[in-house]
């Protein structure tokens, strides 16, 4: 928002700031109103003065040029060559003398024009940047004082501030509002602009009637009827005031409404009373679907929620936003109905946003205008219209205000102020500050009861008063002090620390962390998870009954999630279709379920997802199942938690396999004999339906169970210095045979020297006979006390192979 210092000076003495505007800018910024830019307009008119043409002759060397002798006062006469033709001897003109710099960085200096010396330039308004078009040079009134600086004469000896007014300080969106703030900050006297109005003593009730129906959106509506006005250009002073803050002049009536809005912060609207059908103003909601044409000719369809100002036939104004073309003031207007109102900020804001219409009025109404300033603004505007456009005002006016807005009093003690600020507040300062703010203040005992003025929407509680004390006393006066820190042992949440450790480990395994909303769509979750009995069979707490959200954001977020798998699948699906053909994701979060007694509970889970073939890994074949990669990651997690007693189990009953997983590539995880989660490959039909063309696997673990007994004691062992021996075997086995059972048998048979065992290849191609698969297994052997001898290696491998032959009838290929 732009503020003119000269305009501000009408209401509060700011004389000392004309030479040092940065001092005022600094004070305003410290007070919470940031000054973004200071512009000294007078500098644009340095060396530009009013001149008097004494003589005008033809240029001796150019027919289209004239040679003028121009006085700039005190006996100083300049010879100036001019190319315009609209001037004559005796005219008062604007002269740019050597040293002046005009818009476009055009520097004026002494020069020769067609062989004749010229010491300046006679200017048009366009050349001074004051008009877009000009015909010839500017001719001033005959009484314009010769030699006077044009900036001072034209009202351009001004300083303007560009302010960033925060949303809570709507009371400062005007010159008087800012003057009130300056008065408060500096303790200066405030001069209130006159709203005295001379009337014709007659009643206007028969001219325009008023009916406020939507009083819930319009607590106050006032209006005046003016007749006999003459629409035309505004006087120079009014134009200059508007132009000083970047607003163009339209006509005298509209300019006055804009002037009062910029002066007092009260938006107004002027209707051509001749076009108000039925001679009645109705304040009511719009009719859904009806059309409205704005002042600029734009047609919009109303949705029925907007507050409108109407006549008996149609809307004539969108309340607080924009006027209608059908009732706007024109050159032929002679009767005006002048409106001033207090519309609820919510109403103006919604209308403005729904139709994308931002105006100076909507900007103010959306933030809140002073309901007690309505009549002052109305009468001020009416008086100015009579001054600049003539006419007469009727003695009465409309003022619908059935329930006056009242601010709630705030109770506070000086101790509260001191405690909140951290230093001793002074009672006499507090009382002074409250009075400067325009508050009514009473004291009873140690408690002050403060009644804020209606224009301060932001003062509602004691903390607001504490803030005002700190602001007016100066934030720079808050003493520097180190915070008092109590010497107490720090508390670390065990689950939080374990979650952080788990997250760091999974990131180390190449997973990236996903964070999903805890609320999901009931239909979508059920479609993905299917029956939750299968999920429950894996050891994860789940119930068919979902926990519904009372006030959901939308139907896609109406229940609390029962599993992390649904969210991770959506992440996987989105990533794949965004071009990420391979990836690893994990999430640590809560799931929610209903207990047997009907109460709600939540559990802590870890979910993991892997998709895409490991074709870019040198030690993995193209057909290496991703579920094995996921299994390996889970086992690394178990190892980090020092959990060694675990097994993978494939349920005999297929109903225990969740519907979104492959029934033949699924396993439940048992830790110390208790089910704590699952891993599995996503069901082929699910992948096909979602057009995911790579294998994918999911895991979900119950962290509440895994974290029990943490931290588990570690058994410290020295690292063997003796070499490890690897041996690879390939077996052809029935597809129905579980590889996990084979590995378990190898561990048992090779106990003593067997360090580890793992699958490194799986083949089920066309070259295999029906119902068979080829599994390649690697074992690692090590003696912790000596280098392995060949006889030891052969003895151990023989034990393993004999056991596999005996128990599974397996032989090496």
UniProtKB/Swiss-Prot annotation:
The residues covered by the FDX-ACB domain are 720-813
Q: Where is the tRNA-binding domain?
A: 42-151
What Pfam families would the database entry show? B3_4 (PF03483), B5 (PF03484), FDX-ACB (PF03147), tRNA_bind (PF01588), tRNA_synthFbeta (PF17759)
What are the protein's GO molecular function terms? ATP binding; magnesium ion binding; phenylalanine-tRNA ligase activity; tRNA binding
Q: List the CDD domains.
A: PheRS_beta_core, tRNA_bind_bactPheRS
| Name of the top EC class for this enzyme | ligase
> Gene3D superfamilies of this UniProt entry?
3.30.56.10, Bira Bifunctional Protein, Domain 2, Ferrodoxin-fold anticodon-binding domain, Nucleic acid-binding proteins, Phenylalanyl-trna Synthetase, Chain B, domain 3
GO BP terms: phenylalanyl-tRNA aminoacylation
**Which keywords fit this entry according to its UniProt record?**
Aminoacyl-tRNA synthetase, ATP-binding, Cytoplasm, Ligase, Magnesium, Metal-binding, Nucleotide-binding, Protein biosynthesis, RNA-binding, tRNA-binding
Highest taxon of the lineage? Bacteria
The EC number of this protein is 6.1.1.20
Grouped into one coarse class, the protein's main location is: cytoplasm
State the InterPro entries in the record: aa-tRNA-synth_II/BPL/LPL, B3/B4_tRNA-bd, DNA-bd_dom_put_sf, Fdx_antiC-bd, Fdx_antiC-bd_sf, NA-bd_OB-fold, Phe-tRNA-ligase_IIc_bsu, Phe-tRNA-ligase_IIc_bsu_bact
| The record's free-text note on cofactor binding | Binds 2 magnesium ions per tetramer.
**Ranges where the B5 domain occurs:** 405-480
Residues where Mg(2+) binds: 458, 464, 467-468
What cofactor requirement does the entry state?
Mg(2+)
PANTHER family on file: PHENYLALANINE--TRNA LIGASE BETA SUBUNIT, PHENYLALANYL-TRNA SYNTHETASE BETA CHAIN AND LEUCINE-RICH REPEAT-CONTAINING PROTEIN 47
UniProt lists the family membership as follows: Belongs to the phenylalanyl-tRNA synthetase beta subunit family. Type 1 subfamily.
Assembly and interaction partners: Tetramer of two alpha and two beta subunits.
Q: What is this protein called?
A: Phenylalanine--tRNA ligase beta subunit
Per the UniProt record, the source organism is Bdellovibrio bacteriovorus (strain ATCC 15356 / DSM 50701 / NCIMB 9529 / HD100)
Q: Name the gene for this chain.
A: pheT
